[in-house]
UniProtKB/Swiss-Prot annotation:
Belongs to the CheB family. This is Protein-glutamate methylesterase/protein-glutamine glutaminase 3. InterPro entries: CheB-like, CheB_C, CheY-like_superfamily, Sig_transdc_resp-reg_Me-estase, Sig_transdc_resp-reg_receiver. GO terms for molecular function: phosphorelay response regulator activity; protein-glutamate methylesterase activity; protein-glutamine glutaminase activity. Keywords: Chemotaxis, Cytoplasm, Hydrolase, Phosphoprotein. The modification 4-aspartylphosphate is found at D53. It comes from Rhodospirillum rubrum (strain ATCC 11170 / ATH 1.1.1 / DSM 467 / LMG 4362 / NCIMB 8255 / S1). One of its GO terms (cellular component) is cytoplasm. SMART domains: REC. It is found in: Cytoplasm. The keyword Kinase does not apply. The gene is cheB3. Its EC number is 3.1.1.61, 3.5.1.44.
Length: 370
């Protein structure tokens, strides 16, 4: 029996979430109206999973989450709106240690909650099995972002953008990630060195209203430029492209340039942006030896078979290890298929990519500088 603490100031929302879990079976549920009641329930009920609203009286969700992670860490699933403000706060919650989020329905709650019943059950069930990722803490991350932003603004002249690569020179790093991804990407991507010679394309399962906010957030954290991918955008060395949420993204070429192109969510793919579709498009567009695939934490198996094919054809792949994954679903499936050249903790992935790229820069540009 999984013990779930539902924290929400809306009596209707509490009731519907409780009914969904109890009707399905296998859940014991306690409810709380605000963060203060949640902290009391943390001690008396000792839940396996907490669903946590963001906007509540007396103590808001972020404050409550910080207290939970500081005193008695538990897997927390945030309940968030799809507004830009909701996206910003939810991403902050994920950075503080929440494992996932559920979209709070707009309009008629009773009708719209039923539409996301499967999502609620899947995410609460997965959260119960999740590893809690320790965050740096808000003040530490803000200092890190400030330092990186200053470094980006004061980058010396000899670290100017790399020359555009031709179709016969350029390669691409593809990163696929789902549950636990925002916090993991905030650990991995800032470690990529200035002057990284290949573009990086990231498919993070996320709503469309979240990805532009997430791209801006990562841009503040990273020495490389981070942008949300848009139609027919040329792939440039040292730029990180975030796939637009609720859609897919593919790689193709136009004239003498490779481009990244958002596409409507494909019906043959279960998750979006689809890691599988992204990797398959790269295999059609580029020689496999110029593809590096990285599969990070997440539920399911999106991207696992496609990245295994990259390895089979002579490309390189990295799977995040189980110990550092919030959910060892996607990377675990890659490992099961024998599709990972390396299995690494999140803390070592950027360093490995930098090492590979250092050799690439020496070959293409005649320099070994990283």
């Amino acid at each position: 029996m999984t013990k779930v603490l539902i924290v929400d100031d809306s009596a209707l929302m509490r009731r519907h979430l409780k009914e969904i879990l109890e009707v399905h079976g296998g859940f014991e549920v306690m409810v709380a109206r605000n963060g203060i009641e949640a902290l009391a329930g943390l001690e008396s009920f000792d839940p396996d999973v907490i669903t946590l609203d963001i906007n509540m009286p007396e103590m808001d969700g972020l404050t409550c989450l910080s207290r939970i992670m500081a005193t008695k860490p538990k897997p927390v699933v945030m309940v968030s709106s799809l507004t830009e403000t909701g996206a910003e706060v939810t991403l902050e919650a994920l950075a503080l240690g929440a494992v996932d989020f559920i979209h709070k329905p707009d309009g008629t709650i009773s009708l719209n909650v039923s539409r996301i019943e499967r999502e609620i059950l899947d995410k609460v069930t997965a959260a119960a099995k999740a590893r809690i990722r320790r965050s740096l803490g808000l003040s530490s991350r803000l200092r890190t972002a400030s330092d990186r932003g200053a470094a980006k603004r004061t980058r010396p002249a000899d670290s100017s953008p790399l020359p555009t690569l031709s179709l016969t020179e350029i390669g691409v790093v593809l990163i696929g990630v789902s549950t636990g991804g925002p916090g993991t990407l905030e650990e991995v991507l800032p470690g990529l060195s200035a002057g990284f010679p290949w573009p990086v394309v990231v498919a993070q399962h996320m709503p469309g209203s979240f990805t532009p906010v997430f791209a801006r957030r990562l841009n503040d954290l990273c020495p490389l430029t981070v942008i949300e991918a848009s139609a027919q955008m040329p792939l440039e060395p040292g730029v990180i492209y975030i796939a637009k949420g609720d859609a897919d993204v593919v790689i193709g070429h136009r004239a003498t340039r490779f481009v990244v192109n958002p596409m409507p969510a494909g019906p043959h793919y279960l998750w979006h942006p689809s890691v599988t579709r992204l990797v398959e498009s790269a295999l059609r567009a580029l020689p496999p030896e110029r593809i590096i695939g990285v599969l990070l934490t997440g539920m399911g198996d999106d991207g696992a078979e496609a990245m295994a094919e990259v390895k089979r054809r002579g490309g390189r792949t990295i799977a995040q290890d189980e110990a550092s994954s919030v959910i060892f679903g996607m990377p675990g499936e890659l490992v099961k298929r024998g599709g990972a050249n390396l299995v690494l903790p999140a803390s070592r992935i950027a360093g490995q990519l930098n090492a590979w790229m250092s050799r690439t820069k020496e070959t293409v540009y005649g320099t070994g500088q990283s």
